From Swiss-Prot:
It is found in: Membrane. One of its GO terms (cellular component) is enterobactin synthetase complex. GO terms for molecular function: holo-[acyl-carrier-protein] synthase activity; magnesium ion binding. One of its GO terms (biological process) is enterobactin biosynthetic process. Mg(2+) binds at residues 106, 108, 150. EntB, EntD, EntE, and EntF form a multienzyme complex called enterobactin synthase. Keywords: Enterobactin biosynthesis, Magnesium, Membrane, Metal-binding, Transferase. This is Enterobactin synthase component D. Pathway: Siderophore biosynthesis; enterobactin biosynthesis. Its cofactor is Mg(2+). Involved in the biosynthesis of the siderophore enterobactin (enterochelin), which is a macrocyclic trimeric lactone of N-(2,3-dihydroxybenzoyl)-serine. The serine trilactone serves as a scaffolding for the three catechol functionalities that provide hexadentate coordination for the tightly ligated iron(2+) atoms. Coiled coil: none annotated. It comes from Salmonella austin. InterPro entries: 4-PPantetheinyl_Trfase_dom, 4-PPantetheinyl_Trfase_dom_sf, 4PPT_N, Enbac_synth_compD-like.
Amino acid sequence: MLTSHFPLSFAGHRLHIVDFDASSFHEHDLLWLPHHDRLRSAGRKRKAEHLAGRIAAVHALRRWASGVPGIGDKRQPLWPDDLFGSISHCASTALAVISRQRVGVDIEKIMSQHTATELAVIIDSDEPQILQASSLPFPLALTLAFSAKESVYKAFSDRVSLPGFDSAKVTSLTATHISLHLLPAFAATMAERTVRTEWFQRGNSVITLVSALTRWPHDRSAPASILSAIPR
Protein backbone atom coordinates (compact mmCIF):
# COMPACT_ATOMS: atom_id res chain seq x y z
CA MET A 1 0.00 0.00 0.00
CA LEU A 2 1.30 3.43 -0.90
CA THR A 3 1.94 5.61 2.14
CA SER A 4 3.74 8.78 3.12
CA HIS A 5 4.84 9.57 6.67
CA PHE A 6 5.81 12.72 8.46
CA PRO A 7 6.18 13.61 12.15
CA LEU A 8 4.67 16.71 13.69
CA SER A 9 5.28 18.29 17.09
CA PHE A 10 2.01 19.14 18.81
CA ALA A 11 0.94 19.78 22.41
CA GLY A 12 4.27 18.55 23.78
CA HIS A 13 4.10 15.29 21.84
CA ARG A 14 5.32 13.92 18.54
CA LEU A 15 2.48 12.95 16.25
CA HIS A 16 3.24 10.54 13.44
CA ILE A 17 0.95 11.08 10.48
CA VAL A 18 0.59 8.58 7.65
CA ASP A 19 -1.34 9.47 4.52
CA PHE A 20 -2.29 6.37 2.56
CA ASP A 21 -3.90 5.34 -0.70
CA ALA A 22 -6.43 2.64 0.13
CA SER A 23 -6.88 1.81 -3.55
CA SER A 24 -3.28 0.57 -3.63
CA PHE A 25 -3.86 -1.89 -0.77
CA HIS A 26 -3.19 -5.58 -1.42
CA GLU A 27 -4.02 -8.47 0.88
CA HIS A 28 -0.37 -9.48 1.14
CA ASP A 29 0.41 -6.09 2.71
CA LEU A 30 -1.13 -7.41 5.93
CA LEU A 31 1.49 -10.16 6.24
CA TRP A 32 3.73 -7.50 7.77
CA LEU A 33 1.45 -7.57 10.83
CA PRO A 34 2.01 -10.39 13.36
CA HIS A 35 -1.75 -10.45 14.00
CA HIS A 36 -2.82 -10.45 10.34
CA ASP A 37 -5.01 -13.53 10.88
CA ARG A 38 -7.23 -11.46 13.20
CA LEU A 39 -8.15 -9.25 10.24
CA ARG A 40 -9.16 -12.03 7.87
CA SER A 41 -12.88 -11.22 7.99
CA ALA A 42 -12.49 -7.43 7.89
CA GLY A 43 -13.46 -5.44 4.82
CA ARG A 44 -10.86 -4.02 2.45
CA LYS A 45 -11.30 -0.46 3.73
CA ARG A 46 -10.96 -1.55 7.35
CA LYS A 47 -7.82 -3.53 6.54
CA ALA A 48 -6.20 -0.54 4.83
CA GLU A 49 -7.06 1.76 7.76
CA HIS A 50 -5.73 -0.73 10.30
CA LEU A 51 -2.50 -1.18 8.38
CA ALA A 52 -1.95 2.57 8.07
CA GLY A 53 -2.58 3.02 11.78
CA ARG A 54 -0.03 0.36 12.68
CA ILE A 55 2.52 1.91 10.31
CA ALA A 56 2.04 5.22 12.12
CA ALA A 57 2.37 3.43 15.48
CA VAL A 58 5.65 1.76 14.47
CA HIS A 59 7.08 5.16 13.56
CA ALA A 60 5.90 6.55 16.90
CA LEU A 61 7.40 3.64 18.85
CA ARG A 62 10.89 3.85 17.36
CA ARG A 63 12.05 6.25 20.07
CA TRP A 64 11.41 3.61 22.75
CA ALA A 65 10.92 0.17 21.24
CA SER A 66 10.66 -1.89 18.08
CA GLY A 67 7.92 -4.09 16.72
CA VAL A 68 4.26 -3.70 15.79
CA PRO A 69 1.62 -3.14 18.50
CA GLY A 70 -0.57 -6.20 18.79
CA ILE A 71 -4.33 -6.29 19.08
CA GLY A 72 -6.22 -7.02 22.31
CA ASP A 73 -9.41 -8.89 23.03
CA LYS A 74 -11.39 -5.66 22.64
CA ARG A 75 -9.49 -4.87 19.44
CA GLN A 76 -7.43 -2.24 21.27
CA PRO A 77 -3.73 -1.68 20.44
CA LEU A 78 -1.34 -3.40 22.85
CA TRP A 79 1.54 -1.15 23.88
CA PRO A 80 4.85 -2.07 25.57
CA ASP A 81 4.93 -1.90 29.36
CA ASP A 82 5.28 1.61 30.81
CA LEU A 83 4.17 3.23 27.55
CA PHE A 84 0.82 4.63 26.51
CA GLY A 85 -0.30 5.15 22.96
CA SER A 86 -3.20 6.07 20.76
CA ILE A 87 -4.09 5.52 17.10
CA SER A 88 -6.74 7.18 14.96
CA HIS A 89 -7.66 7.28 11.30
CA CYS A 90 -10.06 9.13 9.06
CA ALA A 91 -10.47 8.91 5.29
CA SER A 92 -6.92 8.56 3.90
CA THR A 93 -5.01 9.64 7.02
CA ALA A 94 -3.87 7.67 10.06
CA LEU A 95 -1.90 8.95 13.02
CA ALA A 96 -0.36 7.67 16.22
CA VAL A 97 1.26 9.07 19.35
CA ILE A 98 3.27 7.43 22.14
CA SER A 99 3.93 8.80 25.62
CA ARG A 100 4.93 7.79 29.11
CA GLN A 101 1.73 9.50 30.25
CA ARG A 102 -1.80 8.57 29.32
CA VAL A 103 -2.56 9.99 25.90
CA GLY A 104 -5.48 10.01 23.50
CA VAL A 105 -5.62 11.29 19.93
CA ASP A 106 -8.42 11.52 17.40
CA ILE A 107 -8.88 12.75 13.84
CA GLU A 108 -12.30 13.55 12.40
CA LYS A 109 -13.54 14.97 9.12
CA ILE A 110 -15.28 18.30 9.71
CA MET A 111 -19.04 17.84 9.51
CA SER A 112 -21.16 19.41 6.83
CA GLN A 113 -23.72 21.99 7.90
CA HIS A 114 -26.49 19.46 7.28
CA THR A 115 -24.85 16.79 9.45
CA ALA A 116 -24.09 19.29 12.22
CA THR A 117 -27.71 20.42 12.28
CA GLU A 118 -28.93 16.83 12.55
CA LEU A 119 -26.47 15.89 15.31
CA ALA A 120 -26.93 19.07 17.34
CA VAL A 121 -30.01 17.56 18.99
CA ILE A 122 -27.91 15.03 20.94
CA ILE A 123 -25.63 17.49 22.70
CA ASP A 124 -26.26 18.93 26.17
CA SER A 125 -28.60 21.91 26.36
CA ASP A 126 -25.75 24.19 27.51
CA GLU A 127 -23.26 23.13 24.86
CA PRO A 128 -24.71 24.88 21.76
CA GLN A 129 -24.28 28.28 23.40
CA ILE A 130 -20.66 27.48 24.30
CA LEU A 131 -19.86 26.19 20.83
CA GLN A 132 -21.47 29.20 19.15
CA ALA A 133 -19.67 31.63 21.48
CA SER A 134 -16.33 30.33 20.20
CA SER A 135 -16.73 32.25 16.90
CA LEU A 136 -15.86 29.04 15.06
CA PRO A 137 -18.27 27.78 12.39
CA PHE A 138 -20.80 25.55 14.13
CA PRO A 139 -19.95 22.41 12.08
CA LEU A 140 -16.28 22.79 13.06
CA ALA A 141 -17.13 23.43 16.71
CA LEU A 142 -19.43 20.41 16.92
CA THR A 143 -16.86 18.20 15.22
CA LEU A 144 -14.35 19.32 17.84
CA ALA A 145 -16.76 18.41 20.63
CA PHE A 146 -17.13 14.88 19.29
CA SER A 147 -13.40 14.51 18.63
CA ALA A 148 -12.30 15.83 22.02
CA LYS A 149 -14.60 13.40 23.82
CA GLU A 150 -13.21 10.55 21.73
CA SER A 151 -9.63 11.55 22.60
CA VAL A 152 -10.42 11.60 26.33
CA TYR A 153 -12.04 8.17 26.13
CA LYS A 154 -8.99 6.79 24.32
CA ALA A 155 -6.69 8.11 27.03
CA PHE A 156 -8.61 6.13 29.67
CA SER A 157 -10.10 3.29 27.64
CA ASP A 158 -8.48 0.66 29.86
CA ARG A 159 -10.17 2.16 32.94
CA VAL A 160 -13.66 3.04 31.76
CA SER A 161 -16.44 1.36 29.84
CA LEU A 162 -17.50 2.91 26.56
CA PRO A 163 -19.03 6.25 27.59
CA GLY A 164 -21.82 8.05 25.79
CA PHE A 165 -21.53 11.50 24.24
CA ASP A 166 -23.36 12.93 27.26
CA SER A 167 -20.76 11.64 29.75
CA ALA A 168 -18.72 14.83 29.29
CA LYS A 169 -19.77 18.44 28.69
CA VAL A 170 -17.94 21.12 26.74
CA THR A 171 -17.18 24.06 29.03
CA SER A 172 -15.01 26.19 26.75
CA LEU A 173 -13.71 26.24 23.19
CA THR A 174 -10.95 28.45 21.81
CA ALA A 175 -8.83 28.51 18.68
CA THR A 176 -6.38 26.06 20.27
CA HIS A 177 -8.14 24.00 22.94
CA ILE A 178 -11.46 22.64 24.13
CA SER A 179 -12.24 21.92 27.78
CA LEU A 180 -14.54 19.12 28.94
CA HIS A 181 -16.24 18.60 32.29
CA LEU A 182 -16.40 14.88 33.10
CA LEU A 183 -19.63 13.53 34.58
CA PRO A 184 -20.19 10.39 36.69
CA ALA A 185 -21.35 8.56 33.55
CA PHE A 186 -17.77 8.74 32.27
CA ALA A 187 -16.21 7.20 35.38
CA ALA A 188 -17.20 7.69 39.00
CA THR A 189 -13.56 8.14 40.05
CA MET A 190 -13.07 10.95 37.53
CA ALA A 191 -16.36 12.80 37.92
CA GLU A 192 -16.30 16.57 38.44
CA ARG A 193 -12.97 17.00 36.72
CA THR A 194 -11.99 19.17 33.80
CA VAL A 195 -9.92 17.95 30.87
CA ARG A 196 -8.22 20.33 28.46
CA THR A 197 -7.81 18.93 24.96
CA GLU A 198 -5.57 20.61 22.38
CA TRP A 199 -6.64 20.79 18.75
CA PHE A 200 -5.68 21.97 15.29
CA GLN A 201 -7.18 21.81 11.83
CA ARG A 202 -5.51 19.88 9.01
CA GLY A 203 -7.25 20.37 5.71
CA ASN A 204 -10.88 19.34 6.10
CA SER A 205 -10.17 17.42 9.31
CA VAL A 206 -9.48 18.25 12.94
CA ILE A 207 -7.01 16.53 15.25
CA THR A 208 -7.49 16.56 19.01
CA LEU A 209 -5.05 15.34 21.66
CA VAL A 210 -5.28 14.93 25.41
CA SER A 211 -2.42 13.90 27.67
CA ALA A 212 -3.16 12.82 31.22
CA LEU A 213 -1.48 11.47 34.31
CA THR A 214 -0.03 8.00 34.31
CA ARG A 215 -1.50 7.70 37.82
CA TRP A 216 -5.16 8.19 38.62
CA PRO A 217 -5.79 11.97 38.80
CA HIS A 218 -6.88 12.00 42.45
CA ASP A 219 -3.30 11.02 43.40
CA ARG A 220 -2.01 14.37 44.69
CA SER A 221 1.60 13.16 44.67
CA ALA A 222 1.57 13.12 40.89
CA PRO A 223 2.79 16.17 38.93
CA ALA A 224 0.42 18.62 37.28
CA SER A 225 -0.92 17.78 33.84
CA ILE A 226 -3.57 18.73 31.34
CA LEU A 227 -6.03 16.71 33.42
CA SER A 228 -6.82 18.69 36.57
CA ALA A 229 -9.38 18.61 39.34
CA ILE A 230 -11.81 21.48 39.48
CA PRO A 231 -12.27 23.14 42.90
CA ARG A 232 -14.05 20.88 45.35
